[in-house]
Amino acid sequence: GTVFALLGPNGAGKTTVVRILSTLIRADAGEARVAGHDVRAGADRVRAEIGVTGQFSAVDDLLTGAENMMLMAGLRHLGREAGAARVRELLERFDLAQAAGRLPSTYSGGMRRRLDLAMTLVGSPSVIFLDEPTTGLDPRSRRTMWDSIRALVASGVTIFLTTQYLDEADELADQIAVLDHGRIVAQGSADQLKQRIPGGHLQLEFATVQALELASAMLDGAAREDGKLILRVPNDGSVASLRRLLAELDEGSVEVERLSTHTPDLDDVFFAVTGRPSTEAAAAA
């Protein structure tokens, strides 16, 4: 019932990790377990527990949506009646019932991804590998996919997510690891990773020059913003440190007109640990 996100630059090895853990290829060395089973010695048991959906859809365009689903039910040995019931349930859950009789070539990109994910769920896996599941989707389709992932997590499914979208990891992941040149270079929750990076600060805006000067004299490391009644004060953004700062200003009878916080985001983390901007940040630049 959690989401583990693997981030990394192109070529870092994210898809290779997914292929090893899903038993599609064998590792050169080392050990790994999925759902308690060794991926080398217990590959069949691993496959029985997992589902995999990648950035390139496994949907067959020569079959209708429902036929694609029934094909997966057959591969999972569900039996005709049980398989049909499971297919109906998933088509309804992913809002595909009305399109079930159509060929996937007539689907939108978001619909194809939902069909691909629904096919993965036919066998009720306990662990699902999502390899860049929202690449190429428009913002609305991405949000719809996020909602589907949250629903899976709420039902107890564990998600292993690779993504090039840092906001996606920030939004969905309980734990994040950053992979670079085949090695984990950072790991933790989004908040833990952000706190490792210096640069967090509070921005304090004052109504008068007198208040600005009093605060500047009181607060260690405070820096003025040229031409404005604004101070920037180093701060980790925690509630405790914010309370201490406000108490100090209150004791000095200094009134703050406006306050805002800035903490490093995952782009800052990514750049700090890999030496490169994320794919998303590079595209924006």
What are these regions (language model features)?
Residues P9-G13:
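Walker A (P-loop) phosphate-binding loop of ABC-type ATPase nucleotide-binding domains
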Residues G30-A41, V46:
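Conserved ABC transporter NBD signature motif
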Residues M70, G74, E81-A99:
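Conserved ABC ATPase "signature" region
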Residues S124:
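Conserved catalytic motifs of ABC-family nucleotide-binding domains
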Residues I128-D131:
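Catalytic Walker B motif of ABC-type/P-loop ATPase nucleotide-binding domains
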Residues W146-N235:
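ABC transporter nucleotide-binding domain
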